[in-house]
Amino acid sequence: MDANKEKALQAALQQIDRQFGKGTVMRMGDKELEAIPAVSTGSLGLDVALGIGGLPKGRIVEIYGPESSGKTTLTLQVIAEAQRKGGTCAFVDAEHALDPIYAAKLGVNVDDLIVSQPDTGEQALEVADMLVRSGAIDVLVVDSVAALTPKAEIEGEMGDHHVGLQARLMSQALRKITGNIKNANCLAIFINQIRMKIGVMFGNPETTTGGNALKFYSSVRLDIRRIGSVKDGDEVIGSETRVKVVKNKVAPPFKQTEFQILYGTGINRLGEVIDYGVKLGLIDKAGAWYSYNGDKIGQGKNNAIQYLREHSDVAQTLEDRLKAELLGQSFDEAVEAEAESE
C-alpha cells in the first residue's frame, strides 16, 4: 500500500479505537483464526452433519418442522448437553407447554434451568435480550416464534386484522439481539412452526412463521421431520427422525442425518454410536454378534447398546474415536476438545 494511504488508514483506525473502543475494527491477519465453539446436539450424526461437532455458540439457530416432529426434544437435548459441560441455560416458553418431568427424563437439570413464561411477544423477546446481555447464559431457547403474540393482538378483538405485526416484531428484535448474542458467545435457538402458503401451484408451499428476518439472521437452520415409528414388537416406543441442515454459515450446508427419538429417554445416541462404529469398521459385526477390540459386546443391537450403557468409559472412547474420524481431527484433538469443554 502507498505510504500516504497507510498513514491515513492508521490515523483512521486509531480514531475509531479512541471513539468506539479497542477491537472495533481489526485486520483479519492480526488475530489467529479460531475454531467456532459448539454445543453438542445429543445426536452424533447431527453433530457430524453440522460440520463443527454441534450448534455454533454466539450465533442464532432456527429449528422448524411439523407438529410432534421432535423440535422441543432436540432443544432440550442441547440444553442437557450444555448443562453437562457446566453451562447455564434459559428457556423462554412462549407456548406455555414445557413439561419439566419430560425435560428431566432427557437429562436436563430442571432445578438449574431458567424458565420464563411471558404474556406477550414483546415481553418474551425483551426477557431473552436481557438474559443474553447478562453474559451469563450459554444456551437460550425460544419456544416458539409462532407463539410470540404481539401485545396489540392480545389486547385487540378476536376478529381484528394485524397485518405483519409479528414479522415487524421479529425483525426489530433480531436487529437488536444479534450483536448481543455474538458478544455474549451465547447459542440462541428459535423453534418455529410450519404454515402453508395459499395458492402455490409449483414448488414447496411450506413456510415458517414470523416473516423472513429469522431466515436471514440464522447461521444454522434445521428442518426436522418424523419419518416413521420405532417398534418393540407391536408397541411403538419412539420415532424415526430425519434432520436436514437447510442453511449453514459455519460449514458446508445441505447435509442430512437420521436418528431415533425414544419416548421418555430422548435421542438414541448409543444406537448411533454402534451404527457409525460398524460403518467405519471400529465395531465388528458377525451375524447378530457385535465385537469391539476383539471382545464380544452383545448379540443383537439392543444388547450391544446395553453393554455400552453399562460400560460408559468404553462408550466414551468409542465416541471420541468416531468423532475424530468423522470430523477430520486427530483422536488426541478429539479427547482434548472433550476435556476442555468439561
Curated annotation (Swiss-Prot):
Entries under SUPFAM superfamilies matching the protein: P-loop containing nucleoside triphosphate hydrolases, RecA protein, C-terminal domain
Keywords: ATP-binding, Cytoplasm, DNA damage, DNA recombination, DNA repair, DNA-binding, Nucleotide-binding, SOS response
CDD domains for the chain: RecA (cd00983)
Keyword Zinc among record annotations: no
InterPro entries assigned: AAA+_ATPase (IPR003593), DNA_recomb/repair_RecA (IPR013765), DNA_recomb/repair_RecA_CS (IPR020584), P-loop_NTPase (IPR027417), RecA-like_C (IPR049261), RecA-like_N (IPR049428), RecA_ATP-bd (IPR020588), RecA_C_sf (IPR023400)
Keyword Ligase: no
Annotated binding of ATP, by residue: G65, P66, E67, S68, S69, G70, K71, T72
Gene Ontology MF terms: ATP binding; ATP hydrolysis activity; ATP-dependent DNA damage sensor activity; damaged DNA binding; single-stranded DNA binding
Protein name: Protein RecA
Native source organism of the sequence: Teredinibacter turnerae (strain ATCC 39867 / T7901)
UniProt lineage: Bacteria, Pseudomonadati, Pseudomonadota, Gammaproteobacteria, Cellvibrionales
Gene symbol of the encoding locus: recA
